[in-house]
Each structure stands twice: as C-alpha cells, then as structure tokens.
C-alpha cells in the first residue's frame, strides 16, 4: 500500500499541548500507510512516538492499545506500553500523537534469517498467545506481517509493534498487505475476525520457513492456497505443522487459542521424540538436535509457562 504524503513531520523538539511533556526527536523509525513512528527522548527515556494524517486513526490505535493493556500481565505482553496521548501544532495544524514504550528488537523475518528456521514454531506459538489476548478484547490485528512483529533483544520475545491495521470485530479490515491478505488469496473476505489474523499468520509461517526462491515462486496470479500447501508438503520444517496451517488457510479455527494448542502439541511431541532418540544413543543428527534445539526449548519453556497460565 502506498504511503500517505499528508503525514506530518515531527519537528526536532516539541511539547504536547495538554500534558506539556517535552520530546526530543532522535530519528524516524518507520513510515506506513497511516502514520510515521519516531524514536524520541523524553526526560532522558527513549520512547517511540507515532503521528498520523488522521487523528481518528491515531485515536483508534490508542483505544486498542488501552484495551489490551487492561489487566496487563507480564506473562503475555501484547503491545508496547502506552505512555502519553496528546496534540501538537505543526504548521498551524493540530495533530494527534501518542508516545509508547520503545522496544529494542529485530524484525521477525530478519531474526529468523539470522538464527535459522528452527525458531519459527516457537515464535509463532508466542505470536498466537498475543493474538489470543487481542482477540479476547474484541480486536483483530489486520495487517499481520513480519514487518509488524519484532523479537526483543533482551529476552527474545515476540511483540506486535504497529497497530495501524487494528479493527473491531465484524468491521472491514482497515489496513492489509496483499501478500498476507485472505481475500487476495481467494480464501475469504476482509471481515475482521480471528480467522482473518490466523490466515495471515499461516501465510507468514510458510514465508518465514521457506527460501526466498521458493517463496517467490508462490507469488503468481491468481494466488491460490494450493500453492502454499505444495510448499508445506515439500518443506521438512513445515510438514510436521501441516494440519494447523491448512486448518488456518480454510478458516477452521474458532480462535488463536485453539491453533496455539495444536502447535504446542506438535512441538511437545517432537521434543519427546528427540529426547527418546538421544536416550537410545541413536545419534545426534536432525534439525531439532543441537545447540539451537536447546536454545529453542529454553525459549519455549517461557512460552509454555504463560500459554498454560492463560
């Protein structure tokens, strides 16, 4: 989707009209269809500030962020902590912005490219836990893609970072990317419902676990989910998860919790199989054996904890 040229540019320093907090702009972090995000300093603390062309769009994001932070639980942190909402004047025009916790992390696809595809199931399970909270609050993320998800550097946890596409259940999705859009794949409409997010997540899983060459081959017209199924069938990392992925393609999950349970069961089964193989002394080969397997399981232990506690 094209960028909105009407998005105002933040001045090097500004103060909120109502709350009177002063911000020093350090650099622009990113720009999307309905807003731009800047890294700022406020009283010596780094924050991320988002400003958009339309105040109503910004306020809808604020509403969603406040909603998922109700009863905020450290076990499942869905989104950055909202810190401030205010107005400022830019070139004589009143503009709404919000400041949030700055998350130091790596984009999801870049993290997988650096660490390997063995991490994909663990990260997807984490993401499902976060989507479950969002859906329980009556929202759909909408524009789910690797660019809108980061893995934090401090603890390798998945976080959603761009709420520009969040939409109330039952409405038309406000923002989407065709590559992950259910309608573009001729698999449904753009009605905001949990199944819409789960379809996008399944497509994203296939992309993350595939080579660039294989993924490029799927981007033909017309898009059909049968192409994605072919990739899964021929991919050793994806094949064990074929049932939940295909169910997500066909809208057969009532919610993220159900898909998360299926993914967890598969990971647990593979973990048990690896442990039995190692105990029998039958060798140490296989994609889930070795240092990365251990690291993945340590990360999964944290994922399982809050997954079971929810």
Residue ranges, per PLM feature:
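Short beta-strand micro-motifs within the conserved protein kinase catalytic domain, predominantly
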Residues: 78-96
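C-terminal single-pass membrane-anchor helix
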Residues: 271-310
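Conserved short submotifs of the Hanks-type protein kinase catalytic core
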Residues: 91-107
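C-lobe/activation-segment region of protein kinase-like
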Residues: 159, 164-232, 238-242
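ATP-binding glycine-rich loop module of kinase domains
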Residues: 22, 26, 33-64
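Juxta-kinase regulatory segment immediately upstream of eukaryotic protein kinase catalytic domains
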Residues: 1-18
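Activation segment signature within eukaryotic-like protein kinase domains
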Residues: 123-124
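Catalytic-loop of the protein kinase fold
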Residues: 134-152
